[in-house]
Design a protein with these regions (language model features):
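Gly/Ser/Thr-rich loops at beta-strand to alpha-helix junctions
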Residues: 72-79
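Glycine-rich oxoanion-binding loops at beta->alpha junctions
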Residues: 8-71
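Structural motif
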Residues: 71-72, 94
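Short, well-ordered secondary-structure micro-motifs
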Residues: 7-8, 82
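Short connector loops at secondary-structure junctions
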Residues: 1-7
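A generic "cationic amphipathic patch" detector
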Residues: 51, 82-83
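Hydrophobic/aromatic ligand-binding patch that stacks against planar heteroaromatic rings
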Residues: 60, 83-84
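Short, acidic/small-residue loops that bind anionic groups at enzyme active sites
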Residues: 84-96
Length: 96
């Protein structure tokens, strides 16, 4: 969720700096790489810096044209994914 919190929906430069479009070419060979390409973090947007950032996450999803998400993670990711689902975001969650 950290990447979503770094994006300012009104600033195209921050979108470009904090997101990557996945294409056939960009994901080719991932299966032969070790480690992770996901750049994970332990951030809960509901408690980030003592301010609920759910609205910002929803704005970023809208700005990026994301109408469904597949989330992979632990308890925190699954909890926030369920929170987004209750708000109408289409989410498929996969526990780690």
């Amino acid at each position: 969720w950290q990447g979503f919190l770094e994006i300012d929906p009104a600033d195209p430069a921050s979108i470009a700096a904090n997101s990557v479009s996945l294409t056939r070419e960009s994901v080719r060979g991932i299966d032969r790489m070790g480690g992770t390409i996901l750049h994970t973090s332990r951030t809960d947007p509901r408690t980030h810096q003592a301010t609920d950032k759910t609205g910002q996450v929803l704005d970023v999803l809208d700005k990026l044209g994301i109408d469904a998400m597949v989330t992979l993670g632990g308890d925190g990711t699954l909890r926030f994914s369920a929170h987004l689902s209750r708000l109408g975001v289409k989410v498929i969650s996969i526990p780690k």
